Amino acid sequence: MTILVPFYTKTNFINFIIDALSFDEYDSVVELGCGYGQNLFKIFYNGGGVNLRYFGGEFTSSGVEMAKKLASIEPNMRAEFFHFNHLKPKFDKNLDFGKRVLVFTYHTIEQVKEIPDNWFKVVASIAPFVRCINGEPFGFQIEDLGEVSKEHRKFFIKNGWNLNFASTLKKANQNGDIIIEDAMLEHSCGTDPFNPTSIAVWRSV
């Protein structure tokens, strides 16, 4: 089956993060699973500004190294990159994120077969106030929205990709570790109709 998706229907997730930053005051923005930091650089150059601090957690040492090199070219960007493993989430105590932090992930948990039960609790504890926006494909874990959801589930099972994001998120909310603020099972119409993005917005207690 072929579905042609016009480019103009594509929703830019980074603009979504920039908008979120404009609705509240934050000391820093943190991306977990940042690769070489391209999303953080886009945020900086498209409205994030110089007063915000930028942090990127990445599993690969090459990604962390490249992000640091790129950040060193921009003297006005206060950026710091560090190792982060979704399977064993922890943060160095020397990392100072400030008092109010916006965290986000974007299709980085999708290939982690199972995140641990404490993932949300650990992330929520990095600052006095944490809001997190997860842009991950988890809608099919909650509800069958049609043929795409069915194929989506089959694809993830075949590849050994994540199947427990939604259940772990619900448990964290039920346990009082976090407060879920909003969620969308499918986020508009991306250019990849067979791997649609879902969005979860939650904050620390």
PLM segments and residue spans:
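Conserved glycine-rich SAM-binding loop
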Residues: 35
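Class I SAM-dependent methyltransferase SAM/SAH-binding core
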Residues: 38-88
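Conserved beta-strand signature within the Rossmann-like core of class I S-adenosyl-L-methionine
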Residues: 128-140
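A short glycine-rich, Lys/Arg-flanked "PGG" loop and its adjoining helix->strand segment in the class I
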Residues: 118-130
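Class I SAM-dependent methyltransferase core
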Residues: 31
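A short SAM/SAH-binding and catalytic strip from SAM-dependent methyltransferases
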Residues: 101-115
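Conserved alpha-helix/loop element of class I SAM-dependent methyltransferases that forms part
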Residues: 4-25
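Conserved Class I S-adenosyl-L-methionine
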Residues: 147-173
